[in-house]
Amino acid sequence: MTGTPDVFPPATPGGAPLVALPAGPRKPDQVKGKLYIKTHGCQMNEYDSAKMADVLAASDGLELTDTPEDADVILVNTCSIREKAQEKVFSQLGVWKGLKNKGREVIIGVGGCVASQEGEAIIKRAPFVDLVFGPQTLHRLPELIRARREQKRPQVDISFPEIEKFDRLPEPRAEGASAFVSIMEGCSKYCSFCVVPYTRGTEVSRPFEDVVVEVAQLAAQGVREINLLGQNVNAYRGPYGDGEFADLGLLIRTIAEIDGVGRIRFTTSHPLEFSDSLIDAFRDVPQLANFLHLPVQAGSDRVLSAMKRGYTALEFKSKIRKLRAVRPDISISSDFIVGFPGETDADFEKTMKLIEDIGFDHSFSFIYSRRPGTPAADLEDTISDAEKHARLSRLQERINAHAAGISEKMVGTVQTVLVEGPSRKNPNELTGKTENMRSVNFPAPARLIGQFVDVVITEALTNSLRARVVAE
């Protein structure tokens, strides 16, 4: 690799859309090849990876492969939430470097939040990398690849062209009965531990009509479950009508009216934005799944203040109480950070009490990971690693016990399952998910794949349920 990287500026001042990429047949001079994508991190990254594949299929005719050795273009979509995830990326890049040493003309690109955070530093650390692009510039991949091949030097584009990404994506392609739809990007909360505002930018909502059109297109292709995505999804304020804005509650109500949409989910939420309008949607919209992921992070007001979360434990419990008034049996999952700088034994016990009071069904819980550039990175950390691991173990054991109890109570009940496909453990059975995100395996004919089916839960296992189809 020769030359210094080209750094792409925003497309136009303010991020105005460029000419849309073609979504139709490949041009005669386009080279058909193979594309491999490795995805780390959250559901938003999974969505972005799918869009990378869509863009490169439309522009260059690239087809996905499960084997990097067969690929002409290799992309890694990165996550910078935790240090270990970041280091895994460079370890993986080192493996792929060997493919270039074999004389193949392979394009290797790094996208996602690590790319946004590190930029040209990635090229300096791994000079064999050809492309570095941020979450907001994945739509420019065809241009970046073309420029790399023509100019013979690496290309870097980690700009924040606001909503331009969505204006230039091909029409969505359904991959099964469930689909992700991104409705907003970025976060403006600036929690003291979090890198998201720095890697994905501040909150920008997609226009209301654009989201509704995408959902309708997916439903017409057989999608039955819509997962609305955003770093702070319930802060959605989509331009709507003449100078007005639609919130998440209105968006959910509108999507529920689209023919074919049988279940709606959304993630990830922030407690500050969990509004009465959204609670009313849980009351009024039966398609809205009986499940909520609402990250609380801690149960101590002192720690929540240090995290700059903007609410107290009592305020969090008040919102859950109002929600359960309209959905008494709703399952609640959350995120927890254990060992945040300055967290005392008393602080941790308050987190454990909150877990007991709420009865969380599931959690994504981690030991605090210092992220350079965030305010919390400057806080003194006096908690031993042994204590952090002990606290995490206690927390996870408590939540797992709650989850097991909920699963046991489901035995004998009728649950509606969206059938995803054959079971991985037994191809003669089907598998699907309940509203509260339980995987269910049951004997049934393959013609039910992609449909909602009522089943009776017959057994609760550690990580799944067993069931039988309700006789028609």
Curated annotation (Swiss-Prot):
Keywords: 4Fe-4S, Cytoplasm, Iron, Iron-sulfur, Metal-binding, S-adenosyl-L-methionine, Transferase, tRNA processing. [4Fe-4S] cluster 2 binds at residues 187, 191, 194. Residues 1-24 are annotated as: Disordered. The keyword Disulfide bond does not apply. This is tRNA-2-methylthio-N(6)-dimethylallyladenosine synthase. It comes from Stenotrophomonas maltophilia (strain K279a). SUPFAM superfamilies: Radical SAM enzymes. Monomer. Disulfide bonds: none annotated. GO terms for molecular function: 4 iron, 4 sulfur cluster binding; metal ion binding; N6-isopentenyladenosine methylthiotransferase activity. GO terms for cellular component: cytosol.
